[in-house]
Amino acid sequence: IAGNSGKAFKGQRSDGTPVFVKYEMPPIVSVLAREQITPPILSANREAGMGHRVEQEWLNGRTLERQDMGSKQVRQILVRMHYSRILLNQALQMNYTYMKPQDLVHRWQKEAPARLAQNTYLQSICQDLLNHLPNFRQEVATFVHGDLHHTNWVETTSGLVYLTDWE
């Protein structure tokens, strides 16, 4: 299956049911599946020489288009994800950490392509952001996904929408 990891496959269970198989899936996905943000997990186990293997329900449907990102279902999933204390607490138990706003700006400055990082206008925006950031309040921090591109979302033939990429 197309993607950056090279560890995602379409498989088939012994009863012929198609499944999405992923090796080395982040542990948070099981919590996201319970919250109905990602597709249901059918099984998870360790395989010798292959690592952690997860099978998720195979979804027949389509990848969302850019114009779909404002849909009611996408908004509802994001609200559920961003305001779930269960999800945040589970993530913290799995050693995920809080990222403060200044951390995000510093990360961008460090990881942006040189052409963007050297752009004086963007440098001034980063500096302005750093100079005017509000104080970080951990009690209102939320769990977020760093790449909400429309290609990371699927709408099933039955109309359900899931966020699918957690790399």
Segments (PLM) and residue ranges:
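Active-site catalytic-loop/activation-segment of kinase and kinase-like phosphoryl-transfer enzymes
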Residues: 93-134
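Protein kinase glycine-rich loop
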Residues: 1-2
